[in-house]
Amino acid sequence: MKQNSSNKAIFALALSSFCMGVTEFIVAGILPDIAKYFQVTQPTAGWLVTIYAIGVVIGAPLLSIPLSPLNRKYQLLINLGIFALANLTIAISSNFYLSLFARVVAGFMHGVFFVIATIAAAKVAKKGKETQGIAIMVSGLTIALVTGVPLGTFVGQTFGFQAVFLLIFILTSIAFIAVFIIMPNHLHGSATKIKYLILALKVPPLLKCYIITICTCGGGFVLYTYIADLLLNISHFDKKMIGVILFLYGVCAIIGNLVGGRLTDLKGSIMSLRIILVGQAIIYALITLSAYSQTMVIINLCLMGFFAFGGISPLKTLTMISAQKYTPNFTDSSISINEGAFNVGIALASFVGGIVFARLGIVFNPIFAAIFVLPALLITLKSSRTI
């Protein structure tokens, strides 16, 4: 595939990834508006977040099965088409339960999208730059965190939350058209079955990949889920500064994601993860020590964003290579479990973080974040450097 066409295809995937990211993260910023519109409590409206995450975990492995025999291009078109319609449903719905249903459908599509897009990005990328291709695709997700969510929150609070989901529908439709025009037709899928999911879980090297993903991705969320409390009550920032600090965190997350992709192409996924995991553990521990210094906590949170998102591309690459090596006949199934593992890590880490916060206080959350990533570090230290 020509370099120019390759870049266009990857950026089409990045735009799709951006739409997925905004859809996942936006509800938290407009939750009061949604609750007021549907006349439900905020905890009830919060199910729009929970049900989406459940959809991602379930959708990644299970929906890979019916889509797997199709060409990658058509997999993406079906995926984006349903995702767009789910967001349009939320934009025009006046029924909370219909919106809840649309959210779980969108979550299903989110989960399976990153299975398809990870493979597609690696296939269309220039030889030797496969991981950078994956990193650029994933950057849509991190850009959504930095720009899409703040802008979406502003739009939702100004014009109503329906406007946000209408914009997501429009952007996803543009991504659909871009994929239809640009994505090559030669990216063939491989049929998969439920039994392949079970078999993948029985392969020790892949099981190690999933544990690494859960711990590496989850670690930061032991702290991040409750970061506002740390900044307000320990570091004593003004409430207006929270958005600025999280913006800086997101910018560093984008940089970390791109650097992680480049590092993986140069050093391999295992060596990259060793570097990133050591960085994560050190930074998490330093946040506890620096929590009372506003300057140092900002610096360390920026580094936290860098290392937290720096691990995404090597995690995806490690699993993709391992799946191709150990389960060549059902690669998609093995990769789909790893996509679910990302959200398992987030959910588990948030749960652990909540217990630590309630029992010991927020200042201990960074320490437990460091502990959370240690199993992943130990596994990578004992693994071959050749992957």
Question: Where on the chain are the PLM-derived regions?
Answer:
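A late C-terminal transmembrane helix in Major Facilitator Superfamily
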Residues: S322-R359
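Cytoplasmic helix-loop-helix junction between adjacent transmembrane helices
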Residues: A102-G140
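Helix-to-loop junctions at the C-terminal end of transmembrane segments
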Residues: A60-R72, N257-G268, F357
